[in-house]
Amino acid sequence: MIIKNIPFLIAEISANHNGNFKLAKKLIRCAKRNGADAVKLQTFTADTMTIKSKKKYFKITNGLWKGYNLWDLYNKAHTPLSWHKKLFAYGKKIGITIFSTPFDETAVDFLEKLECPIY
């Protein structure tokens, strides 16, 4: 996987799948085709990131997500847990490493069960 003195290129998918599983797979294919060694996901749910609140402290007041509250943003941006196993298998099938950044202890436990190679 990692060879001394050779760059290991990682493509970050993050929320760029826009909630579309087919697009997530397409992004993985594109990463592979363009020379990436691995694709990184993010593992979290809205509930593990914040609380569902409409109070002003949880409202985004500027930028791309202006008007959203934090819970809605994280709910929109997350990679569904039900996709992870399928995306890991797809990566293995086409020959690219898939891994993820866990945002909390439950995500670490989840990734351990999937035998995530690194996080």
Regions found by a protein language model. Give the residues of each.
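Active-site beta->alpha loop and helix N-cap motifs at the rims of alpha/beta catalytic domains
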Residues: 64-119
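Catalytic domains of carbohydrate-active enzymes, especially glycoside hydrolases
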Residues: 26-44, 114-115
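N-terminal amphipathic alpha-helix/helix-capping segment at the start of soluble metabolic enzymes
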Residues: 1-11
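Glycine-rich, proline-tolerant flexible connector loops at the mouths of alpha/beta enzymes
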Residues: 37-78
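Glycine-rich anion/phosphate-binding loops
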Residues: 17-34, 80-82
